[in-house]
UniProtKB/Swiss-Prot annotation:
This is Prelamin-A/C. One of its GO terms (molecular function) is structural constituent of nuclear lamina. There is a cross-link at K201 (Glycyl lysine isopeptide (Lys-Gly) (interchain with G-Cter in SUMO)). It comes from the Eukaryota. The record marks T266, E330 as: Heptad change of phase. The gene is Lmna. It comes from Mus musculus.
């Protein structure tokens, strides 16, 4: 069974055999054949889309698996990190507590040392005074040898008195210790009484709050009841309530006053007892001190006490040195532990950052694939909806009549003048290709020539003294920017080199202004290279602009709407098929020579959009912006004017045919 296109071709052939064909009629026939060829290529395109959807499903599965692996690893690392951090905090807290304890002990030891040193100084003064008196006594002894017997008897008497005094001193010291103990007990009882007073005050406040709450509740209940009774009953209940509340207040105030009086009486009595005990103890201590001063005339006891104090002082100093050494060791141990924990935390952060970077790369790839698949689906749906085509392939048409189509179209200029230009579309796209072999990459190049941005993607600082940025704008002279001799780009940092005409502020090390150049330049081919101090190219980014112009025509004869693609400029002027649309790189390809149309289109049309691809030379992500200019009258739907009449869709592999008259070649 013949298709509608075959029937139209048969009818056209019969008419052509019976009547001579006009140039317009020949053009229509040739366009019908081209439309049939488009159907074949659309079928190939649909197969390609299906294969891409299959690949996308596999990639989605891989991305899902990668996300699950990354989430599990991040959760494990996070748990380990939190556990290690908790252990480090516990260790730090224990070290801080031990340090505080050692500092307290050190302060106590220092106070004891100061007290012992003062006592030692005082006893040394007493020793010197006693030695001077000993000399006087020896002189008296020499002058009073005659009264030796009397002195000996007095000596025995004095020795007895000394023994009695020592006993009294021991008793007084015991009494002093007991007085101190009583004073401490009194202070503890005082603190206890103050605590009880505070507790009673809090209980009083609590009782007040309870009574206030009960009062409010009682008022609320009475107010509820007063709604149902008359005014006389209401006044009676209010007076009763006021009397009851007044009695409650009086009772509570009496109890509070009684508690206060009892507490004050108890506190005053205990305070008076403590004061009396302190006074008695101070009197006893004064008497004891006087007796001790009298007893210090004995050199032997002073010497013994002095030697004992010196021994105690030496022991305290040794203990102090031991404590200082122990504190130093604890500090060193704490520093080592903290350094190890910080190093482990830095390693975990680095691993987490690496995994996040890998996940971000996978996510970027997924987003790019989703964008491309969405665009392909929209294009195919628009073509199928407008042309109502089935995916069944037809036989390929030879391209032998392409030249006749071109010549007859030119010869029938008088007929084509009847066509009205409905709409035209201009697409300007920027394709970027980057390559990096070192730590620093050219991250971004401004299309208007305002700035160039570099990024250090490594974990180490990069010295960039005397490095150069070389900018080549097509056939224009080479521009070279040289970094300062001591410039260093830190790890993960970004530096932007602004042209002086951009109006940026010089703020090293993140923003540098090239005062010698007003602009970095702009054009259809921009190549930016980073050269190190040895002259080696370590990074490069190339930006190429391509421009295509698409026109949408309408014929007024019996054949209706048909596709027509204009390949702007002189590209493939002699012969060739309509251009193919490469789905992967999103550039228009010549159907004859397979070269990008931007080389032939050059700078034709208006620049209104850009296509930006980032990453290495092996992959690119493209986003295209376009505008639409409408001329003439009439027009189709959005899908007819903007998408389906713009490009002839085919597979991603360009056709291989003769390229005799191709301007690209």
């Amino acid at each position: 069974m013949e298709t509608p296109s075959q029937r139209r071709a048969t009818r056209s052939g019969a008419q052509a055999s019976s009547t001579p064909l006009s140039p317009t009629r020949i053009t229509r026939l040739q366009e019908k054949e081209d439309l049939q060829e488009l159907n074949d290529r659309l079928a190939v395109y649909i197969d390609r889309v299906r294969s891409l959807e299959t690949e996308n499903a596999g990639l989605r599965l891989r991305i899902t698996e990668s996300e699950e692996v990354v989430s599990r690893e991040v959760s494990g690392i996070k748990a380990a990190y939190e556990a290690e951090l908790g252990d480090a905090r516990k260790t730090l807290d224990s070290v801080a507590k031990e340090r505080a304890r050692l500092q307290l002990e050190l302060s106590k030891v220092r106070e004891e040392f100061k007290e012992l040193k003062a006592r030692n100084t005082k006893k040394e003064g007493d020793l010197l005074a006693a030695q001077a008196r000993l000399k006087d006594l020896e002189a008296l002894l020499n002058s009073k040898e005659a009264a030796l017997s009397t002195a000996l008897s007095e000596k025995r008497t004095l020795e007895g008195e000394l023994h009695d005094l020592r006993g009294q001193v021991a008793k007084l010291e015991a009494a002093l210790g007991e007085a101190k103990k009583q004073l401490q007990d009194e202070m503890l009882r005082r603190v206890d009484a103050e605590n009880r007073l505070q507790t009673l005050k809090e209980e009083l406040d609590f009782q007040k709050n309870i009574y206030s709450e009960e009062l409010r509740e009682t008022k609320r209940r009475h107010e509820t009841r007063l709604v149902e009774i008359d005014n006389g009953k209401q006044r009676e209940f209010e007076s009763r309530l006021a009397d009851a509340l007044q009695e409650l207040r009086a009772q509570h105030e009496d109890q509070v006053e009684q508690y206060k009086k009892e507490l004050e009486k108890t506190y005053s009595a205990k305070l008076d007892n403590a004061r009396q005990s302190a006074e008695r103890n101070s009197n006893l201590v004064g008497a004891a001190h006087e007796e001790l001063q009298q007893s210090r005339i004995r050199i032997d006891s002073l010497s013994a006490q002095l030697s004992q104090l010196q021994k105690q002082l030496a022991a305290k100093e040794a203990k102090l040195r031991d404590l200082e050494d122990s504190l130093a060791r604890e500090r060193d141990t704490s520093r080592r532990l903290l350094a190890e924990k910080e190093r482990e935390m830095a390693e975990m952060r680095a691993r987490m950052q690496q995994q996040l970077d890998e996940y971000q790369e996978l996510l970027d790839i997924k987003l790019a694939l989703d964008m491309e698949i969405h665009a392909y689906r929209k294009l195919l749906e628009g073509e199928e909806e407008r042309l109502r085509l089935s995916p069944s392939p037809t036989s390929q048409r030879s391209r032998g009549r392409a030249s006749s189509h071109s010549s007859q179209s030119q010869g029938g200029g008088s007929v084509t003048k009847k066509r009205k230009l409905e709409s035209s579309e201009s697409r300007s796209s920027f394709s970027q290709h980057a390559r990096t072999s070192g730590r620093v990459a050219v991250e971004e190049v401004d299309e208007e020539g305002k700035f160039v941005r570099l990024r250090n993607k490594s974990n180490e600082d990069q010295s960039m003294g005397n490095w150069q940025i070389r900018r080549q704008n097509g056939d224009d002279p080479l521009m070279t920017y040289r970094f300062p001799p001591k410039f260093t780009l830190k790890a993960g940092q970004v530096v932007t080199i602004w042209a002086s005409g951009a109006g940026a502020t010089h703020s090293p090390p993140t923003d540098l202004v090239w005062k010698a150049q007003n602009t970095w330049g702009c054009g259809s081919s921009l190549r930016t290279a980073l050269i190190n101090s040895t002259g080696e190219e370590v990074a490069m980014r190339k930006l190429v602009r391509s421009l295509t112009m698409v026109e949408d025509n309408e014929d007024d004869d019996e054949d209706g709407e048909e596709l027509l693609h204009h390949h702007r400029g002189s590209h493939c002027s002699g012969s060739g098929d309509p251009a193919e649309y490469n789905l992967r790189s999103r550039t228009v390809l010549c159907g004859t020579c397979g070269q990008p149309a931007d080389k032939a289109a050059g700078g034709a049309g208006a620049q209104v959009g850009g296509s930006i691809s980032s990453g290495s030379s092996a992959s690119s992500v493209t986003v295209t912006r376009s505008f639409r200019s409408v001329g003439g009258s009439g027009g189709g739907s959005f899908g007819d004017n903007l998408v389906t009449r713009s490009y002839l869709l085919g597979n991603s592999s360009p056709r291989s045919q003769s390229s005799q008259n191709c301007s690209i070649m």
